[in-house]
Amino acid sequence: MGIPAYDGDKALEKRLRAAGKSARLHRARDVRALLRGVAAAPPDVVADAWMAMVVDRPSAALKAQLRALKARCDARKPVPGLAVGERLGALRARLARAGVDGFIVPRADAHQGEYVPASEQRLAWLTGFTGSAGMAVVLKDGAALFVDGRYTLQARHEVDPALFSIQHVTRRPPSRWLAVNAPRKAVIGYDPWLLTPRDVARFDAACVEAGAHLKPLARNPVDTIWSGRPAPPLAPVVPLALRYAGESATAKRARLGAVLAADDVDAAVLTAPDSIAWLTNLRGGDVENSPLPLGFALLARDGKVQLFMDPRKVTTAAKAQLGAAVTLRDVAALGPVLDVLGAKGRRVLADPATAPEWVFRRLLRAGAGIKEGADPCQLPKACKNRVELAGIRAAHLRDGAALTGFLAWLARTAPAGKLTEMAAADELESRRAGGANFRGLSFPTISGAGPHGAIVHYRVTESTDRRLKRGEIYLLDSGAQYLDGTTDVTRTVFIGGGRAPTAAMKDHFTRVLKGHIALARARFPEGTSGSQLDVLARRALWEAGLEYDHGTGHGVGHFLNVHEGPHRISQVPNTVALRPGMVVSNEPGYYKTGAYGIRIENLIAVRADGKGAGGRKMLAFETLTLAPIERALIDVKLLDDEERRWLNAYHARVAKLFGPRLDKEAKAWLKKATARV
């Protein structure tokens, strides 16, 4: 169906006037300005959802004209800019003109989130690196890109080593590199919106050690050379119904306000969009893969909230849910509001690990008292309520049905040797999209065939798209967003077609499986942190001298971020205790560079599990994810009786739930895939 012709601005404005009070914008130029932000946001999962920012109840004719205008705006050619190889030199020239000798470029925006909008992708624009975590430090005579173990291979593929030396962020952190490489008396610039106070403290110490000086810059120099930089994203902000949230925004605000009052704090600055979305029961779409409305908030001890975000994107339905206790302001009002708090001598809570240093500088300059502490929404958001947990279970049933059907299809299709990584990922997404409440993927699907599976966070592109081949391992890490929950699952599959896996493949896979089962079966006392459990997932690998260079588990939100804190399961020390209602991933792995990757991931929820000696409360895990685990890669001799019992019970549950939903051929495959070991 083609796009109708655009009848012109005057005709559009006439239709907007005819919409009466339903219209939120009345001039075509305002609609065009809005569309620049719409173009910078991820595409709507629900067709024409963006129109709610223009008009509440558009007629069919008005919808057609809005679509036509959007198509016309989308067809504009992008502004040409510098080639990737020219950007580093241009940045150095800009720094020299400003009297600055170096600059720190994090992969971050003012919200410190994992997914940042296109307008904030400075690290990718400058270096070519597209991973979800990293940082660059640029000096006059050298530059380095810092990534963690998930991205070392990817960085080598994407970044010119003649421009940036690639460093492992934990083995040689950016601050240490700067301490060694910064010339004496050098001025090192940074954007205070993009670094936290803790970041700044580390870099300041490094500069002192090097005899250099760290300086905040009023304007980011990357922005001054970035021609054609996208506009800030605009996606509609909508209410999340109480039947999904399980607790009203009013109750949440009152509960957290009481916590602030008990701590003798007047207000808390919230800079994490997922915290704001959870507190207000709102969802948006400003970034890929997470339903986040970008903005800031100020929560007062009386439970009232000032919400700072572009008012154009807050729909009429969202405003109605906010009510009189929430004041909506433009982002530009944040600074003056913080100034007022300072002038009144208020005590303000801010998180030095997640809030931009700009917030702290503004509050201190205004005279406010600052209490450094964790975002007050983090912990209550992580502990899902009964309604959220019920929704998450329901989402995993739909997700598991889609994935199980896909795995049956894959077993039939892949051995022919024609299926590619990209086509497989697209097939799975289409199956998920057919389910109820689907709102997009929760992260870009990792579809890694053969050696690509060894790249922990591999992202397939048209230039890297590889066929799935017989005799190879295929790693598929995927997830989705649903109105009632967020999923994240990894399955590792052997592409048979008459071939058999090697003994090494089976050994590696089974050791990963043993670690997965050990964590899933864990029973532990209240007060235990994830770092205390991490060894359970690694032990079988360690016994063979093997290891994986990533965490074992990350927190997962409820129709929010697929990666959330404050809890995690990792070798990195973490004092946050696991609590009932927390959802976390269980994903040990093994990666043989140039050959294959193995990872088995289910989401698990912390639950109460009776009492131990002395009446101490005990906890355990409920496995949420449901999909077959590859039997062809299991060396049964390596499993003990308890491990076999766990696997057989898990597969029996999968078969019972999904067998009736499959066609005859897929049902026969599932019977074999879930047979007892």
What feature does the model see in each segment?
Residues 1-78:
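Domain-length accessory/inserted modules outside core catalytic folds
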Residues 79-677:
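Active-site neighborhoods and metal-handling regions in enzymes and metal-associated proteins
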